[in-house]
Amino acid sequence: MAKKSMIAREVKRKKLVKKYAAKRKSLLDEFNAAKDPMERLEIHRKIQGLPRNSAPNRVRNRCWATGKPRGVYRDFGLCRNQLRQRAHNGELPGLVKSSW
């Protein structure tokens, strides 16, 4: 189980990403459309002025059951240990253990 403070930090990051997504996208579109280097520099400074945790690449995928940051399967949102345990218990519909 991950520390509650780490899980809370990730929740806060997700909220910030959602809050600033539109503003960040519009600034990035302006940045890519600008031809003048000075104009690009000015827009880049505006992007840098946004909160650091509002960047989507700062968000880490975590297991929703345990909060573990590693070995998380995107399809289920579970870490490998929880995925195995829940699959054996039959809690994941459609998931079948392979045999050949």
Swiss-Prot record:
> What Gene Ontology molecular-function terms does this entry list?
rRNA binding; structural constituent of ribosome
UniProt-listed SUPFAM superfamilies? Glucocorticoid receptor-like (DNA-binding domain)
Q: What does this protein do?
A: Binds 16S rRNA, required for the assembly of 30S particles and may also be responsible for determining the conformation of the 16S rRNA at the A site.
Subunit structure of this entry?
Part of the 30S ribosomal subunit. Contacts proteins S3 and S10.
Indicate whether Ribosomal protein appears among the record's keywords.
Answer: yes
Q: Which GO terms describe its biological process?
A: translation
Under NCBIfam families, the record lists:
PRK08881.1
Q: Name one Pfam family in it.
A: Ribosomal_S14
What is the protein name stated in its UniProt record? Small ribosomal subunit protein uS14
Task: Write down the superkingdom of origin.
Answer: Bacteria
Q: Which gene carries the instructions for this protein?
A: rpsN
Similarity-based family: Belongs to the universal ribosomal protein uS14 family.
Record keywords: Translocase included? Answer: no
Read off the PROSITE patterns from this record. Answer: RIBOSOMAL_S14
Name the InterPro entries on file: Ribosomal_uS14, Ribosomal_uS14_bac/plastid, Ribosomal_uS14_CS
